Amino acid sequence: MTVRVIIAGGGTGGHLFPGVAIAEELLRRDRENRVLFVGTKRGIEKKVLKDLGFRLKLLNVEGIKGRGVMRSSLALLKLPGSLMQSMKIIRDFRPDVVIGVGGYASGPAVMAAHLMGIKTAIAEQNSIPGLTNRILGRFVDRVFLSFSDGGKWFSAKKAAVSGNPIRAAFFNGKPVLEKTGDQFSLLVFGGSQGAHAINSAFQDALPFLQLLKGCLRIVHQTGERDCESMAAAYSAQGFSARVVPFIRDMAAAYEAADLLICRAGATSIAEITAIGKAAILIPFPYAIGDHQTENAKVLLKAGAAVMIPEKDLTGKKLADEIQNFYSHPSLLKDMEAKAASLGNIYAASDIVDSCMAMIRL
């Protein structure tokens, strides 16, 4: 049975790549299946999806929440037009199901499908859903959750904990640095744009890590802003580090790492739990609804990660946590096992199974 599927949303990698994972699983099962993405011109989807060979249609839509009165009002005025755009795209493509993965395009596309009597689903990556998914959850046929905590926002009849879909290529990474002897590898990153607070704290941590200097192998994704200053800081302190603004092959970077130091976005959490890595999580405190802190708390509660709130982040505290992991390998292994117990490497497959069953009804 071949199917036609629209995947709506994007804007950021955290929304887009779960959709890509679902699309790739659909095509893995049957190359005759057809997938169309619906996004916006401001998101990363235009470049990413072109490189991956997926078709994309664009909506003229913007976010509403947290954008000020004037911009929110203008965004509201665009909603009827984006709904009509979505209906035309749906009429032309004739999908069997429309899946919203979060981001500005998800709302009008999924709602248009619902109004046209087409099967619908949403994937919620965070433990606290955003406004759009809370609204869509009342109308869609299925809600796929990354965290069980998110279930309280949706009907139990619709919601299922699937985990956050990860692309199959993520599990095929080759280490970016080969380890020898007692070397301890750190992967430091703050999302695709880096994180200045993490970069600054790690720079401050270097004097406190001098005793481990010969043992540490560090890969640090800084973002463009801090790349030169961080490279200079490592050099001045005598550390061996690979400092880059952006890591294209995160799978390889994860594979080489003993310990991760990162934000607590939904994609990072999904990757950490899918492959079972110990992590020091530093949630971005200004995320809508503080959802990164809530994401981190899920792992913290399970003993699957350490969390340092950004307001408490210092170089000394960060260095102390790193030294503790280095000195206690059993702690590292235990945390890896607990992280892996929370993940689902079959999330994309489970979501496709559910959608196929829904289409047959």
Curated annotation (Swiss-Prot):
GO terms for biological process: carbohydrate metabolic process; cell division; cell wall organization; lipid glycosylation; peptidoglycan biosynthetic process; regulation of cell shape. UDP-N-acetyl-alpha-D-glucosamine binds at T12, G13, G14, N126, R167, S192, I247, Q292. Transmembrane segments: none annotated. One of its GO terms (cellular component) is plasma membrane. CDD domains: GT28_MurG. It catalyses: di-trans,octa-cis-undecaprenyl diphospho-N-acetyl-alpha-D-muramoyl-L-alanyl-D-glutamyl-meso-2,6-diaminopimeloyl-D-alanyl-D-alanine + UDP-N-acetyl-alpha-D-glucosamine = di-trans,octa-cis-undecaprenyl diphospho-[N-acetyl-alpha-D-glucosaminyl-(1->4)]-N-acetyl-alpha-D-muramoyl-L-alanyl-D-glutamyl-meso-2,6-diaminopimeloyl-D-alanyl-D-alanine + UDP + H(+). Pathway: Cell wall biogenesis; peptidoglycan biosynthesis. Its EC number is 2.4.1.227. Keywords: Cell cycle, Cell division, Cell inner membrane, Cell membrane, Cell shape, Cell wall biogenesis/degradation, Glycosyltransferase, Membrane, Peptidoglycan synthesis, Transferase. It is found in: Cell inner membrane. PANTHER family: GLYCOSYLTRANSFERASE, UDP-N-ACETYLGLUCOSAMINE--N-ACETYLMURAMYL-(PENTAPEPTIDE) PYROPHOSPHORYL-UNDECAPRENOL N-ACETYLGLUCOSAMINE TRANSFERASE 1. Cell wall formation. Catalyzes the transfer of a GlcNAc subunit on undecaprenyl-pyrophosphoryl-MurNAc-pentapeptide (lipid intermediate I) to form undecaprenyl-pyrophosphoryl-MurNAc-(pentapeptide)GlcNAc (lipid intermediate II). Belongs to the glycosyltransferase 28 family. MurG subfamily. NCBIfam families: murG. This is UDP-N-acetylglucosamine--N-acetylmuramyl-(pentapeptide) pyrophosphoryl-undecaprenol N-acetylglucosamine transferase. The lineage of its organism: Bacteria, Pseudomonadati, Thermodesulfobacteriota, Syntrophia, Syntrophales.
